[in-house]
Amino acid sequence: MNKKIILAIESSCDETAAAVVVNGREVLSNIISSQIDIHTKFGGVVPEVASRKHIEAINAVVEEALEVAGVTFDDIDAIAVTYGPGLVGALLVGLQYAKGLAYSLDKPLIGVNHIEGHISANFIDHKDLEPPFVCLVVSGGHTFVVHVEDYGKFEIIGETRDDAAGEAFDKVARAVGLGYPGGPKIDKLAKEGNSDAIKFPKANFHDDNLDFSFSGVKSAVLNYLNKMEMKNEEINKADVVASFQKAVVEVLTDNAIKTCKMRKADKIAIAGGVASNSALRENLLREGEKRGIKVLFPSPILCTDNAAMIGSAAYFELLKGNISKMSLNAKPNLRLGER
């Protein structure tokens, strides 16, 4: 098989990233310029600030990706870029840069769905992973459980009806005074708490409906905190976040396991920033082992937004001849499976 070397660019939120990926599974470089320190003081991502920082960083990030990979533009077979979903201003920075490169170098342009990229991160760390399998996508903006039928072909089994899991983590973290980003801080503090101390609600729909809802548990936490403050009672933050985390993790795990049973799948892959959560990993591994289901995780660097996952997804699009036109535009509300 001829090697296909792809230069990939990701700028959908607050990471400016570029990577060089070979045949969808071998990463020669994966450079990420994070804005997390900038947005922390605002308590969350400020879209306009994110866009400006992408503009400042993108050229240097791409140059570093090429240098670390030991390749030049002449070695690149295609340019890949995230075009949605995400913050429209942030997306446009990466997209316009990639289009400029593709045009000037006369290379194919491949637009990639950001969520599909998260799923494809598993192909990098698990070289023998092939469809079909179930994937649980859990991030700050998205929560899906999908059946991956083939490369680039997905059946959405369940999705969030309101807050994404990562969004709920951020809001609860802010409420208890942990700040941003909430996911890692809750994960760390929860280890010191009793996850059975407080019974927070879990949204369970009918057996054949595997959608998610996290607004209820988020509101329950906020109500609990308000009541404790009104009574002037001491709040054990570790117990609060541990109990909240348990409620979220159990719903995520239950729906992933049920999807495996529904589609007769024996593999679950996890994707997205919340895939780094230690409680989620432990619970899924434990429940999967009970049922003979193999549970796969990307390495932490591939759970967060990165360009290597975009390069992986782009490779399989390239094999199918899915080349984007120069008229490709940013789609902030792009859904999984849409083009």
Swiss-Prot record:
Instruction: State the disulfide connectivity.
Output: none
Q: Binding residues for substrate, per the UniProt record?
A: 137-141, 170, 183, 187, 277
Q: Does the keyword Transferase apply?
A: yes
According to its UniProt entry, the protein's GO biological process terms are: tRNA threonylcarbamoyladenosine modification
Q: How is the cofactor bound?
A: Binds 1 Fe(2+) ion per subunit.
Question: What positions belong to coiled-coil segments?
Answer: none
What are the GO MF terms of this UniProt record?
iron ion binding; N(6)-L-threonylcarbamoyladenine synthase activity
Keyword annotations of the record: Acyltransferase, Cytoplasm, Iron, Metal-binding, Transferase, tRNA processing
What's its catalytic activity?
L-threonylcarbamoyladenylate + adenosine(37) in tRNA = N(6)-L-threonylcarbamoyladenosine(37) in tRNA + AMP + H(+)
Keyword match Transferase:
yes
Q: Which CDD domains match?
A: ASKHA_NBD_TsaD_bac
Cofactor(s), by name: Fe(2+)
Return any one Pfam family short name: TsaD
Q: Which family does it belong to?
A: Belongs to the KAE1 / TsaD family.
What NCBIfam families would the database entry show?
gcp_kae1 (TIGR00329), T6A_TsaD_YgjD (TIGR03723)
What is the protein's name according to its record? tRNA N6-adenosine threonylcarbamoyltransferase
Taxonomic lineage is: Bacteria, Bacillati, Bacillota, Clostridia, Eubacteriales
The gene is tsaD
